[in-house]
Amino acid sequence: MSVKIRLSRGGAKKRPFYSIVVANSRAPRDGDFIEKVGTYNPMVPHDHPERVVLQEDRIKEWLAKGAQPTDRVARFLGKANLIPMPALRETPKKSAPKAKAQERAKAAG
């Protein structure tokens, strides 16, 4: 059984609230989970202390047992210094504007 630390959505329509849970990776996103280890409220300001609340001791225990955090949860854990901060993804060069688009931008601006 592969165990993940991930977000489980709650709240109302257009008012999301997430629980940070430890769950079987094959279980539905909002379905059965093993343990709730924190909360994430994206509706409060970034610097608010209740935006991300973590039970650090329980998370450390699950990480020691081999639970894998999802990308978003890994960022939360990195900011809390529970794991090394994951590397930010660089924008690939192929998505940069091509020569013709750059010429148009120079002409317009």
Curated annotation (Swiss-Prot):
Annotated source species: Rhodospirillum centenum (strain ATCC 51521 / SW)
A GO cellular component entry from the record: small ribosomal subunit
Membership in a protein family: Belongs to the bacterial ribosomal protein bS16 family.
Gene of this entry: rpsP
InterPro entries in alphabetical order: Ribosomal_bS16, Ribosomal_bS16_CS, Ribosomal_bS16_dom_sf
NCBIfam families the UniProt entry points to: S16
Region (Disordered): 87-109
Keyword Acetylation among UniProt keywords: no
Official protein name in the record: Small ribosomal subunit protein bS16
Keyword Ribonucleoprotein: yes
One Pfam assignment: Ribosomal_S16
Bias type Basic and acidic residues, positions: 100-109
Domain of life per record: Bacteria
Signal peptide bounds: none
